[in-house]
Amino acid sequence: AANINIGKEREYGIGMFFFPNDELRLRQAKKMFEIIVEKEGMTFLGWREVPTTPTVLGKKALECMPKILQGFVAKPADVEKGLDFDRKLYIARKVFEQSNEESYVVSLSSRTIVYKGMFLVGQLRLFYNDLQDKDYESAIALVHSRFSTNTVPSWEKAHPYRYIVHNGEINTIRGNADKMLAREENMESDYLKDEMIKLTPVVDPNGSDSARLDNTLEFLLMSGMPLPLAMMITIPEPWENNEGMSREKRDFYQYYATMMEPWDGPASILFTDGDIMGAVLDRNGLRPSRYYITDDDQLILSSEVGVLDFDTTHIVKKERLHPGKMLLVDTVKGELIDDEILKDSYVKNQPYGEWLSDNLVFLKDLKIPNVAVEEYSYEESNRLMKAFGYSYEEVKDSVLPMALNGSEAIGAMGVDTPLAVLSKRHHPLFDYFKQLFAQVTNPPIDAIREEIVTSTSIYVGGEGNVLEEKAENCHVLKIHNPILTNTDLLKIRYAKVKNINVKDVPITYYKGTPLDKAINHLYVAVDQAHKNGANVVILTDRGVDENHVAIPSLLAVSAVHHHLIETKKSTSVSIILESGEPREVHHFATLLGYGACAINPYLAQFSIKKLIQDGLLKKDYYAAVNDYNNAVLHGIVKIASKMGISTLQSYQGSQIFEAVGISKKVIDEYFTNTVSRVEGITIEDIAEDVDYHHSKAFDMLGLKNDLSLDSEGDHKYRSGKEEHLYNPLTIHTLQTAAWTNNYELFKQYTSMINKETSPVSLRGLMDFNYPSKGVPIEEVESVDSIVKRFKTGAMSYGSISKEAHETLAIAMNMIHGKSNTGEGGEDLERLTVGPDGLNKCSAIKQVASGRFGVTSRYLVSAQEIQIKMAQGAKPGEGGHLPAGKVYPWIAKTRHSTPGVGLISPPPHHDIYSIEDLAQLIYDLKNANRNARISVKLVSEAGVGTVAAGVAKAGAQVILISGHDGGTGAAPRNSSIHNAGLPWELGLAETHQTLIMNGLRNK
């Protein structure tokens, strides 16, 4: 390395490489890079082995430590210093990455160099000897330390990335990445021109959320977009409902919103290209970013105050970044540029307002065509509802409350019915998908009280070229509510608007045709529509009759969406669904999540007319439909907010679901990249379900069918219908056994439950693998010892009565088990043993975001303190304790106001991150050093990695709650039945992840 003549400053580029340790593969990778550099018109100067001290590493980091080398590249004489040279290096790096997947290019630039690894920040300087050299100076330093709670740690996924460090999570990353893939087809840059083909895929499909955002920002920068502008359009501030924002700035954000959806989620992002350094905060401000400016022109920004020791008398300014705001330092000009001045320089670049006025089309402004809406007779509508699998409960308990009250029906208790894949019923495909949600690593959002940052707008039509600013880019249709009335759909279908070309594509097929063939025909029809100039396709299942059945709407939408992604057309063609199938909030959420831009639920809306005709709904039809649509929209926003997502534009196509009980072949083919750990139904099974419902509506023998809707027993037990774990017989047997103290009767109850478990849950499919020889009974742990580990579920005072709450505590104390207060606090008089000698004090005291009833006495009386991060029945949201139930004695215990309703727990920003949880654990341990600290999580994909972070944060107990947990109040269908995963999956994942990380014995 000492013999390499690298030339003057910025006349050379430095690459930092993680290479394989195998000598042969190392030589091959190095040679490959040298050839590519020369082929791209540059001169390779030589290699340098980076001096390191591996002894400072931990065991796991040392085991997978790569070979770390630096490569030097000379700038060609005909290339300008700075960005132009970095662009050449970027192209060379992308070509190398595509030809060598075993190596990782940490950085390759003439302006920046990245040192990183799988270790703590305190080990950075000790590991890299370069950083101990006092002559090593830089005007800019970005340093990042993280818990690594949403990805498994590795050398490659450590921060910093090439242009950013990111504290937070991009919750919409699946949709963002898919859309960037599709944009490759229509993005053109004067700076990259024919080189563009070498740069795809722009986004690394195997990268983390931060890595893929870094890929996108780097590509935009290399395509000619200034880095601050790229940050503004990927992480925009909340502008749509901000009346205090200038018209020019709102026009700017509106223009770019037509081409780039927000990369949504909690984020404090620092960025640099070597000349400028900046920081931006997400639209909700869900990550702290504080900074000092000193009298010697230093800017120190960090998530915490006090990360560096220095004389505070030199501080001339203390400030923090505000939600959506940006700060920039230009080291070339020696300027600190604040948010307003920085953004002003971009929002006035073009006449965005004029462009929008001339091109952006609003749904409300489209003319209503002189075309009649297709209507159905009473009998026809019943027949179609049977064909689409409607049940009596869905209409009465879901559609009716939404049309009547404008909000989703509230339910209580938990779920004791089978998973869709285990049910004997023919469930709609929607029921096989479970909603994911935020816990610990980022907070859910209160969509009602944070309305200013929430946007429901969706854009329909072909997307413009984000790399070129021009008026026609924003020639799209803007829809404020993606749930369309029949009139809305007619306006779109017959729109006489330039650049909005609409084509109907049927999703019905002749009964008897294999479903996979019908989907292939659908692909051909969509491709033909696009070839003929359509940039909006309406997938419609109107046309179901005795000979034609409909492809399940979710399957049709997702299949077409992924087909368009694969053929790089998804930003050129928008999908609108006209379907009789969706009727519940969860149905619409999955359709949006898998690619639909808007949905017209024509049959659900017609069922409202039937409710009015039957006298069950006394309301104007159009008002009722409007309330139903708004209720659905509100429900979707709430589902998105549980994941920390503020905009439906970002939620659309983000696939934030886990499939339970669908075969891998179906997932890979039609729901690509969906998390799925339990296989099940095939494409033939799905077709069988479709045919079953169709045959109930259309009898091929010509017999008269019963067209009344079946009561399936989803919410209440119905004999001969859906199985329930707790049915009248099991409940009666348990109650009688308890009342009569009859152990034999109790054994009958447990036998019934174990027998009933089989068709209901995953654990019912398992059996014990008994050894050939058992253990003598005298060697088995005693009953008295076993029951000490019994704990009741957390049920708050207020959700259940005082008598029930106290009885549970007394019973558990008598057997030396532990009862749990729930989040509602506990009466002071219960903290001491009463004169009757009964101990009513719950051993486990729960602490949730509302801190209801949490006092010093409450905490010191605990044997275990449980931090409630989420609840199985309603993860990411709180139940509603109505004002009428907040009695004076409830309010006293909770330290709230009588007669004022409570959201329990409130989704405010109590825990922003794993660091916040670590702080709370520390504080609670100081309040009661004898109590064990427990953290309650809910089962979902990735909970094991979160649990590993929780263990690192100091928790001694981790509770995994399942989707079937109980609640006092939550949306019946969207939350109780469709959020969260079985605890069996979460428990297994958590156990395995803790073992893998050496944390299980802690």
Region locations from a protein language model:
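Conserved short alpha-helical segments that host acidic/polar catalytic motifs at enzyme active sites
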Residues: A1-G464, K470
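Short, flexible, solvent-exposed loop/turn segments with mixed acidic/basic and small polar residues
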Residues: A2-E9, V783-I786, D923
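Glycine-rich phosphate/ribose-binding loops and adjacent secondary-structure elements
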Residues: V95-N100, Y104-V106, V121-Y128, V143-I197, ...
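Hydrophobic/aromatic-rich, well-ordered segments within soluble, folded domains that form packed cores
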Residues: I170-I173, L321, M326-V332, A804-G817, ...
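Mobile "lid/hinge" segments at catalytic clefts and subdomain interfaces of large enzymes
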Residues: A177-S210, D295-G306, T312-D330, G595, ...
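Flexible, glycine-rich loop/tail regions that form catalytic "lids" or insertion modules at the edges
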Residues: L220-A267, F271-D275, S303-V307, E340-D516, ...
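Acidic low-complexity segments
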Residues: V502-V505, T897, I903
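Active-site beta->alpha loop and helix N-cap motifs at the rims of alpha/beta catalytic domains
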Residues: L902-H908
